[in-house]
Amino acid sequence: MHNRGMSSPSSPLSSSIADLRKSYERAELGEEASHADPLRQFDQWLQEAVAAQVPEPNAMTLATVGADLRPSTRVVLIKGYDERGIVWYTNYGSRKGRQLAGNPFAALQFHWVELERVVRIEGRVEKVSDAESDAYFASRPLDSRIGAWASPQSEVISGRGVLVANAAKYGAQFLLQPLRPPHWGGFRLKPDRWEFWQGRKSRLHDRLCYREETPGAWVRERLAP
């Protein structure tokens, strides 16, 4: 017995989704044109995404795994990157924060649709220093700083009014200088694996994988699409 409002596998809606296709012909990714250092390759592609005015080029999917071995994903914003790793900021008490506390390994993915490119990054995660978190928090707009106090991220709340009331309370309490909440700060993922994907015609996509064999020493390999 089918639930009303749910489409069966043979429904017209399902068929139309199955027929959606795109031919990727914008660019290619060869070993000779790619950097030996994956961080340089990432920097080049990110800058090209910014230059191409890709919407939210800094948005990345973060995948974590909890103690129950169930994976979960969400979109966060990259806030910095260098030879130490990829940085983002969040509520440490959120679902992702709790999962990273128990299992400090994660995966990131950037998908720049307009450029037909994907970057996947895997590695170990650690908190950034308090000084780094303090500096970034102080640079945020006032409303965002108050929001970090107002939102008990990932907790069940009775309605949006809870957030509005909390924002008003903390806004009055801190006026113009809210300090960083102790439950809020940055994470840094130290990559040990990168993959760069460039869409190609006939589904024969380019995939270059970088594996860290020893600290700072990368092996670049081509993967079958």
From Swiss-Prot:
The lineage of its organism: Bacteria, Pseudomonadati, Pseudomonadota, Betaproteobacteria, Burkholderiales. GO terms for molecular function: FMN binding; pyridoxamine phosphate oxidase activity. This is Pyridoxine/pyridoxamine 5'-phosphate oxidase. Binds 1 FMN per subunit. Gene3D superfamilies: Electron Transport, Fmn-binding Protein, Chain A. GO terms for biological process: pyridoxine biosynthetic process. It comes from the Bacteria. Homodimer. Its cofactor is FMN. Catalyzes the oxidation of either pyridoxine 5'-phosphate (PNP) or pyridoxamine 5'-phosphate (PMP) into pyridoxal 5'-phosphate (PLP). It comes from Paracidovorax citrulli (strain AAC00-1) (Acidovorax citrulli). Substrate binds at R21, K22, S23, Y24, K79, Y136, R140, S144, R203, L204, H205.
